[in-house]
């Protein structure tokens, strides 16, 4: 009599347990936050550690404009804004508020504007000393669906109420600009 073999098809849990990158500085941060997460047992450190593992697509950039908006809405002027990703400048933002920011990477112009406004820019190892439990911090992240590839996802282009961008071979006169767009060529929708 033979036993039924167990199906091991779904045994593997697919999630990152370390960053794909071989960047030594990132890996040092992972070591640090692994220690903090184990010793403090705080949700903040668990989230930071998880985000340090993420791919670049899942760590989208955040502009100063959005940071300023969320910072103002939170109404906690003493809190440190934490972004596991890149912070970019936004020329449309005229007045940068005085804030303390901690991010993996800050563009040069964004850094200059924050410092000029009387704020400061921290690294994650400095944040670990200042706030090891995540107390008095504001954790933010950019929009993951803002990239161009995401604009093609969703209902098929052309069906009612679809705002999906079509995959067009070329942007010329003949490509998706004639039939259905003007009455002289077939019909006009």
UniProtKB/Swiss-Prot annotation:
Record's keyword terms, sorted: Cytoplasm, Ribonucleoprotein, Ribosomal protein
Cellular compartments per GO CC: cytosolic large ribosomal subunit
Any Pfam family matching the protein: Ribosomal_L18
Subcellular location per the Swiss-Prot or TrEMBL entry: Cytoplasm
UniProt cross-references to SUPFAM superfamilies, sorted A to Z: Ribosomal proteins L15p and L18e
Primary residence: cytoplasm
GO biological process: translation
InterPro entries membership: Ribosomal_eL18, Ribosomal_eL18/eL18-A/B/_CS, Ribosomal_uL15/eL18, Ribosomal_uL15/eL18_sf
Domain of life: Eukaryota
GO molecular function term, any single one: RNA binding
Family the entry assigns: Belongs to the eukaryotic ribosomal protein eL18 family.
Protein name from the UniProt record: Large ribosomal subunit protein eL18
Species of origin: Drosophila pseudoobscura pseudoobscura (Fruit fly)
